[in-house]
């Protein structure tokens, strides 16, 4: 978007209001501001803010108070950062240019399939900040009501890759993995990266922070080492150690994905085409050539039936093949959490227990890691077909994975032990019997109410698994919180929702 301050347009003095509105640029102006009157600007309209060669499109709110003078404009943090200005700098305000790509969104609402150029224009405008949340919601809802077909999914994936940065590696094979999700815990990524790198593979893993879950991979890894790496640092870490676990949000890889995901979470929609474009665009941008997809299947996981899992795997494979990617999907048990910890630090402790070969390391996490890492090793060509799981277990038991993980952490800025919560309370069984059902969604909700992931030490430590015999008064789990208020809030939720773990006599 090209615009510059010109003498003909009145300028306003910029003030930093230190308002955090997620990624939404917001500005405040007085209703009697001469620019508002001259331009005919109304509350909640989109405006273009110009500061030298930089521009940002923002949502306008108007006020009637002495908080601002008529010649001033207050900017949110997102707007301030985008313009890179200083307190008191002059900016201009105009109507934004016509958003032509919205015509394609309207066509999609009416059932028309979109071509490459139309999806490219939409994604470009989204990344440039020209789409309001309403317009984004319209686009995503249209692709949910009439799901993306194969060609649209391929076109959208390509468009999402094209607007971001790309990593390229000299190695002919670059491996990656992704878990479709829906399971608390299941923190396999740091372990898989360590195993892959210890066996000579290149695995530049970029991961997300939690959006609605108690922990993302980046949140967990951050309790062990810095994850906020720029592209140059990430490249140096991978070139030195063969792998990394970094926060993808610190880079510009598939930037449209973060925007789409934020709206999808608010709308509580999760469509197959968007999921495929989201996953594969990030893998392609990171330079991956061989990818393992873990698809947990269970009644409270994201994918709830084998049929749905097979359909998703087929479409993932088709889209991946169109980009020359080698992909393998694994269908795994999604009936209960993997590992004992739910929350960044508690999940990190599970990771360390497995890496250090501790006697009480969660066996289910160790087995899941061996399954996923084994597939990565086989796909990467360092293990024969059928021998990957054995090699993964050997890499852990020999200490090679732990040694490599420490080296990766050191390269990323230094290893640290995860923090411990100040408050810990047991949740006790009220009856004797066998554990027959664990509600993943209730567990995730409870861990978040305890403070995760913002309080990295908060969360849940499970003490039972499906099939375990339980005695009344026995701890089913321990609740961890950093403040007494968060602990009380979480305990109140437990009182209101009933059983999280169902026990049958």
From Swiss-Prot:
One GO MF term = thymidine phosphorylase activity
What keywords were assigned to this record?
A: Glycosyltransferase, Transferase
UniProt cross-references to PANTHER family, sorted A to Z = THYMIDINE PHOSPHORYLASE
Entry's EC annotation: 2.4.2.4
Query: Which SUPFAM superfamilies does the protein's record reference?
Result: Nucleoside phosphorylase/phosphoribosyltransferase catalytic domain (SSF52418), Nucleoside phosphorylase/phosphoribosyltransferase N-terminal domain (SSF47648), Pyrimidine nucleoside phosphorylase C-terminal domain (SSF54680)
Which transformation does this protein catalyse, written as a reaction?
thymidine + phosphate = 2-deoxy-alpha-D-ribose 1-phosphate + thymine
Family indicated by similarity: Belongs to the thymidine/pyrimidine-nucleoside phosphorylase family. Type 2 subfamily.
- SMART domains given for it? PYNP_C
Q: Name one GO cellular component term.
A: cytosol
Top EC category: transferase
Q: Name one GO biological process term.
A: pyrimidine nucleoside metabolic process
Q: Tell me yes or no: is Heme among this UniProt entry's keywords.
A: no
The protein's name is Putative thymidine phosphorylase
Organism field:
Tolumonas auensis (strain DSM 9187 / NBRC 110442 / TA 4)
């Amino acid at each position: 978007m090209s615009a510059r301050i010109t003498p003909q347009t009145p300028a306003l003095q910029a003030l930093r209001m230190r308002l955090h509105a997620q990624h939404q640029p917001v500005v405040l102006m007085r209703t009697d501001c001469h620019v508002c009157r001259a331009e005919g600007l109304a509350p909640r309209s989109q405006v273009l803010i110009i500061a030298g060669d930089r521009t940002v499109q923002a949502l306008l709110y108007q006020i009637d108070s002495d908080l601002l003078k008529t010649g001033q404009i207050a900017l949110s943090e997102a707007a301030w950062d985008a313009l890179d200005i200083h307190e008191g700098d002059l900016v201009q305000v105009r109507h934004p240019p016509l958003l032509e790509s919205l015509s394609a969104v309207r066509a999609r609402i009416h059932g028309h399939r979109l071509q490459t150029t139309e999806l490219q224009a939409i994604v470009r405008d989204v990344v440039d900040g020209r789409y309001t949340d309403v317009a984004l919601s319209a686009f995503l809802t249209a692709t949910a009501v009439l799901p993306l077909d194969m060609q649209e999914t391929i076109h959208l994936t390509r468009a999402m890759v094209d607007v971001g940065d790309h990593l390229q590696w000299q190695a002919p094979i670059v491996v990656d993995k992704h878990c479709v999700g829906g399971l608390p815990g299941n923190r396999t990524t740091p372990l898989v990266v360590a195993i892959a790198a210890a066996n000579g593979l290149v695995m530049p893993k970029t991961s997300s922070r939690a959006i609605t879950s108690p922990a993302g991979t980046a949140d967990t890894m951050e309790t062990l080492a810095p994850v906020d790496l720029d592209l140059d640092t990430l490249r140096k870490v991978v070139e030195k150690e063969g792998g990394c676990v970094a926060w993808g949000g610190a880079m510009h890889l598939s930037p449209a994905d973060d925007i789409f995901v934020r709206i999808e979470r608010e709308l509580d929609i999760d469509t197959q085409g968007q999921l495929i474009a989201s996953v594969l665009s990030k893998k392609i941008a990171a330079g991956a050539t061989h990818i393992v997809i873990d698809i947990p299947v269970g009644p409270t996981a994201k994918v709830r039936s084998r049929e749905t899992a097979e359909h998703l795997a087929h479409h993932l494979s088709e889209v991946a093949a169109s980009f020359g990617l080698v992909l393998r999907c694994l269908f795994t048990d999604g009936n209960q959490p993997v590992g004992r910890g739910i929350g960044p630090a508690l999940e990190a402790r599970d990771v360390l227990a497995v890496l250090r070969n501790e006697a009480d390391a969660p066996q289910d996490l160790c087995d899941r890691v061996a399954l996923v890492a084994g597939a990565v090793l086989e796909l990467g060509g360092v293990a024969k077909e059928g021998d990957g799981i054995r090699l993964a277990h050997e890499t852990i038991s020999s200490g090679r994975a732990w040694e490599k993980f420490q080296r990766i952490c050191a390269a990323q800025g230094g290893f640290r032990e995860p923090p411990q919560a100040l408050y810990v309370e047991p949740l006790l069984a009220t009856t004797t019997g066998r554990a027959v059902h664990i509600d993943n969604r209730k567990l995730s909700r409870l861990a978040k109410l305890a403070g995760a992931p913002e309080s990295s030490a908060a969360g849940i430590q499970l003490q039972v698994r499906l099939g375990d015999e339980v005695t009344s008064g026995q701890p089913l789990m321990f609740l961890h919180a950093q403040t007494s208020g968060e602990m009380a809030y979480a305990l109140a939720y437990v009182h209101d929702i009933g059983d999280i773990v169902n026990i049958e006599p």
